[in-house]
A protein has these predicted regions:
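An N-terminal assembly and electron-transfer interface module characteristic of large anaerobic redox
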Residues: 1-300
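Short glycine-aspartate micro-motif
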Residues: 301-305
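Short glycine-rich, Thr/Ser-proximal phosphate-binding strand/loop in the N-terminal lobe
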Residues: 306-323
Length: 323
């Protein structure tokens, strides 16, 4: 069984985990089936929530921090809490807005989580360890594609990237985590600024924020958008509201976070991505290689006999030999 603390939201306080010396990792669910999830939760739960339940069960995850990002994740918390299997299960309430009052409340909730982390890890908060985890990812330079929408995970990102010659920027709800730096300090002094930094990120769709605040997800170098939705998602499934403002080519795709999407259903997804790449003149070189030169002097004849139960064919070269 894994002792790693897992998380499923960009508002999860990773720097706080690091401050307590915890090992942590993002959930990246891709379910083989939903048999476990549908036994203990409703079948109409969104695919991502069901895939989270499957990963927790199949991987033996026993430490998990969730947020109240949507009703589906609240149900995931309820199911896991009722199972009695979790060693460390925390639900972090995340405000829908960033105001002085919500930031103060969020700091108090972070303090409660910090106390739980101290009990679980047996370590004191180390401000330098927390500060060392503030990492800023360099932004893509030059023309690129932007992957927007709901969580897609590593398999979806790789699938999209393989279809395009251009770099793909993951700006999905779990792919665009970036915090302003917070100076190292004692826990009580660290948490107010840290709460503000977490809530100051580019807002996801569940946050009460104007569309203009999300505009920075798509910069002037974006040539096209792949907008990902998950079946039954509360926030990203209803429609293409955000991407329409950018006046860029948009491809909308939907998955259910199952492996079947990329196997038996993967042909349709690949075909749509390939067609979109072709429309943007961004087909990878492996698909743009010139065909071998034809021998125009060669002459062949073909005969085809098609019946009700079978079809036979024969090809002869110019000397009459069967090829």
């Amino acid at each position: 069984m894994s002792k790693t603390i897992y998380y499923a939201c960009k508002y999860a306080p990773l720097e706080l985990f690091a401050g307590y010396g915890a090992t942590f990792s993002a959930l990246d669910p891709l379910a083989e089936s939903f048999s476990c999830a549908e036994r203990c939760a409703h079948a109409n739960l969104c695919g991502y929530a069901k895939a989270v339940l499957e990963q927790v069960e199949q991987s033996g995850i026993r430490a998990l921090v969730l947020t109240n990002c949507c009703d589906a994740m609240l149900r995931v918390y309820d199911v896991l809490a009722a199972s009695g299997k979790m060693e460390f299960l925390q639900l972090l309430p995340v405000p829908h807005q960033s105001t002085p009052a919500t930031r103060a409340r969020f700091a108090r909730d972070l303090r409660r989580l910090a106390d739980a982390l101290q009990r679980y890890t047996g370590q004191e908060f180390d401000a330098q360890r927390a500060h060392a985890f503030f990492v800023h990812t360099p932004h893509a330079e030059g023309p690129h594609l932007t992957l927007l929408g709901a969580h897609g995970g590593s398999v979806l990102y790789d699938t999209v990237q393989k279809a395009f010659a251009l770099p793909v920027v993951d700006a999905t709800c779990t792919g665009n985590r970036e915090l302003a730096d917070v100076a190292p300090a004692a826990l009580e002094d660290f948490l107010p600024g840290y709460a503000a930094a977490l809530l100051g990120q580019m807002p996801c769709m569940r946050m009460d924020a104007p569309v203009s605040e999300r505009a920075a997800l798509v910069d002037g170098q974006t040539v096209g958008i792949v907008y990902h939705t998950v079946q039954f998602c509360d926030y990203y499934a209803p429609g293409l509201t955000a991407p329409e403002q950018f006046h860029l080519p948009v491809l909308k795709i939907e998955t259910d976070c199952s492996r079947q999407t990329f196997t038996s259903g993967g042909g349709q997804l690949s075909t749509r991505l390939g067609a979109f790449a072709e429309s943007l003149n961004a087909v990878p070189d492996t698909e743009n290689k010139e065909a071998p030169a034809m021998n125009t002097n060669a002459q062949y004849a073909a005969g085809i006999d098609s019946g009700s139960a079978s079809t036979d064919a024969v090809i002869l070269d110019r000397s009459g030999k069967i090829c």
